[in-house]
């Protein structure tokens, strides 16, 4: 039996990864992290979607110690989310160590349940400049974690080279465009669906959706070229 663990926030990217995993694996688990994020509504969104999609198990882990250590606009309500980069060249929504911790804990969970893969929705095509979303980081951590566990757990990043429009096309390919559009929560201000429309996450999500809706065939063709999915299904 093929098993996978999806790092699941209840947002657009991780929900798209989850619906894809359900088509590829016999048993799918999801793990969600409570790190004291300002958009805490995403945890309840993840719970609701996990139940709705009928996965094998959904684990919510308390990792609020990350919020104590990592000062960010996502862990401090008094720090406004900004479009401007900081002096270090990173957005103020970067949470240092977040994906290091999340992927490591997800791998431990995968070890426990006998899963062969950990799936994460990180991407470096359309992304906010976070260093822990880069392909080279994920591959390096994957090697280290597999060595440390003495088990070949595979980190999968199905969205790594997709832009946001192509990610929308992928959700549509699996018949969940409306689910992702209406029920997921990507907004840094905790508003589901189309969100606040003003934060960087909403801007990226909205631009990708409009590009997809304006040229479904063209975007689906790009998705097909990159993944082998999309074009033939007519999404």
Swiss-Prot record:
Keywords: ATP-binding, Ligase, Metal-binding, Nucleotide-binding, Queuosine biosynthesis, Zinc
Family: Belongs to the QueC family.
Source species taxonomy: Bacteria, Pseudomonadati, Pseudomonadota, Gammaproteobacteria, Aeromonadales
Catalytic activity line of the entry: 7-carboxy-7-deazaguanine + NH4(+) + ATP = 7-cyano-7-deazaguanine + ADP + phosphate + H2O + H(+)
SUPFAM superfamilies reported in the protein's UniProt record: Adenine nucleotide alpha hydrolases-like
Protein name: 7-cyano-7-deazaguanine synthase
EC number(s) per entry: 6.3.4.20
Pfam families documented for this protein: QueC
Reported cofactor(s): Zn(2+)
Organism: Aeromonas hydrophila subsp. hydrophila (strain ATCC 7966 / DSM 30187 / BCRC 13018 / CCUG 14551 / JCM 1027 / KCTC 2358 / NCIMB 9240 / NCTC 8049)
Gene that specifies this protein: queC
Superkingdom of origin: Bacteria
Positions annotated to bind ATP: 8-18
Pathway listed: Purine metabolism; 7-cyano-7-deazaguanine biosynthesis
GO biological process, one term: queuosine biosynthetic process
InterPro entries: QueC, Rossmann-like_a/b/a_fold
Record keyword Signal present: no
Cofactor annotation remark: Binds 1 zinc ion per subunit.
Binding site for Zn(2+): 187, 196, 199, 202
UniProt KW Nucleotide-binding keyword: yes
